[in-house]
Amino acid sequence: MRTIFANFALLLLLSAGCKKGTEKIRLNVPETDPNAPAATWREHWFEHVQVVKNVAYTKEVALYYDDDMPRDITWPLRKAEEIWKYTKVAYAPFKGTDKRLYVVLHYGKYGGGHPYTYFDDGHDNRTGIDIGSNNSWRDSSNWNLDVLTHEIGHIVEGGFKGVKESPAFLIWGDSKWMEIYNYDVYKKLGWDKEAERVMKDMETASDNFPRPGTRWFKDWFYPIYSQYGETAVLNSFFTLLAEHFPTKAHAYGLEYTRRMNMGEFIHFWSGAAKHDLAELATTAFGPNDRNGAAWGPQLVKAKTDFPNIKY
């Protein structure tokens, strides 16, 4: 998968069930609604070449389907709106002029998904997600819901706070931040069964970076989340990045100038938690980064380079 700030390979393997929406989908009638989004949108990115149709919209979300998507599948509008509204408050500010989330869904093509933001000329400076699946979209839980949420989380990572890019992407990869983001969204929206499903799946989940057997959710993100403020600590990490990590001017705001190293990552998360997380990092990750370099000296230097990160 590709995005405005990295190549994403969706790694979501979650499962359960949920009721389907039954409301009648509202057609886009732009001639009678001056605030309606465009009735069609011609894709011109990667291998995407479809003319997708706006099948429904609200103030918060514009939903586009390709010609193979059944029009009676309506839950994505409802779920995306709830997630997007929550996310814009929880991780504020979102500085895009157009506050709508543009959700493009495909059936039978373009497996997986990618996000895009208003920083991206290649997606006409809209903010949204584009997802394809070879399986039915009728289930409003499991992979269908998780990938929708996952891609919105990448917008937080690479396009909130008025800054483009994701300094931590090479450290946590595609899905590690998404796991705690998805869990938080489900919990805070009162989707208890979905949150429980994520928690259950994360009990046995592990990765091979920065070392084999690393349990990102269980040993790193969830301890931070549960002990140091839940949503507030997640948001604080991105706020501190926007305030202190190097940026340069961009046509639509600012852009981070580089990725961060593991020592900086631990330093900024410690600042977000207002607690020294070096011991937790050693337990979760071991003493080295994913390239085999000791992160201890990196952390020492990070404290010198970013002295205003306090904990």
Residue ranges and their predicted role:
Residues 19-21:
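Bacterial signal peptide processing site
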Residues 63-76, 133-143, 163-169, 206-210, ...:
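Second-shell loop/turn segments in exported
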Residues 1-6:
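Positively charged n-region of N-terminal signal peptides that target proteins for export
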Residues 122-200:
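Zinc-dependent metallopeptidase catalytic helix centered on the HExxH motif
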Residues 15-17:
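C-terminal motif of bacterial Sec signal peptides marking the signal peptidase cleavage site
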Residues 252-311:
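Beta/coil-rich, acidic/histidine-enriched accessory regions frequently appended to metallopeptidases
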Residues 29-122, 145:
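Zn2+-dependent metallopeptidase catalytic core
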Residues 184-208, 212, 225-243:
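Short helix/loop segments within enzyme catalytic domains
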